[in-house]
Amino acid sequence: MGFQIAIDGPAASGKSTVARLLAEKLGFDHLNTGATYRAVAVYLHEKGLSPSSAEEEIENALKNLKIDYVNGRVYINGKDYTEKIQSPEAGVLASNFARLEVVRRHLVRIQREICDDKNIVVEGRDIGTVVLPNAHLKIFLTASLEARVERKLKEYQKRGLKVTKEEVERELISRDEQDSKRNVAPLKPAEDAVIIDTTSMSVEEVLDRILKLVRERMNT
């Protein structure tokens, strides 16, 4: 088994930036599981399905699903979904579909297959608790709501999306509630996770902290 690093946390806690840069510095593969959930949610929505659809219908739609995550791009059955998953609507869809056991079951299996025997940094909301419970290092990133709203707003503006601060705040509050209260794999730190509050930390400071932990684990 390769060296596996799990990075969990709520939306806009800094997971994606930190995970991507950490993987680059270590020469590891990188998997953004949130992107796979958003892609599958958009895929199911395009097929006319919703979280309230019959489980059998969703199961059938997912049965022969093939997901590839290559250089930060997400492909479903060979079709690139990367641009489609960038909107706030895709994030809300993902949170709604992620509550379903049938969706999580299929995606956890696929995510584990992607990670098998690799040195990899994996980010998401249930990596240390569900997807990779035996990961060599588990990190849980957190930050204040105010800091997360500012980060998400800048991210959307950078993409040219017109959203207000109030809309972003409502989105994050809604996603936090859904992620933490869902019956299947709720968002929470693994018992052996290292919790890092990134509110007043720079990306470089967070990376340095995690790199130190990686070196310690690799040398034991």
From Swiss-Prot:
Residue sites binding ATP per the record:
9-17
> Which EC class does it fall in?
transferase
Q: A single GO BP annotation from the record?
A: pyrimidine nucleotide metabolic process
Q: This protein's superkingdom?
A: Bacteria
Arranged from A to Z, the UniProt key words for this protein are: ATP-binding, Cytoplasm, Kinase, Nucleotide-binding, Transferase
- What NCBIfam families does its record include? cmk
HAMAP family this protein is in?
Cytidyl_kinase_type1 (MF_00238)
**Catalytic reactions of this protein:** CMP + ATP = CDP + ADP; dCMP + ATP = dCDP + ADP
Task: Identify the InterPro entries for this entry.
Answer: Cytidylate_kin, Cytidylate_kinase_dom, P-loop_NTPase
GO MF annotation, one: dCMP kinase activity
Q: What EC number(s) is this enzyme filed under?
A: 2.7.4.25
Output this protein's name.
Answer: Cytidylate kinase
Tell me the classification of the organism that encodes this protein: Bacteria, Thermotogati, Thermotogota, Thermotogae, Thermotogales
Indicate the principal place this protein occupies in or around the cell: cytoplasm
Entry's localization field:
Cytoplasm
Gene Ontology CC terms, in alphabetical order: cytosol
Name the family the entry cites: Belongs to the cytidylate kinase family. Type 1 subfamily.
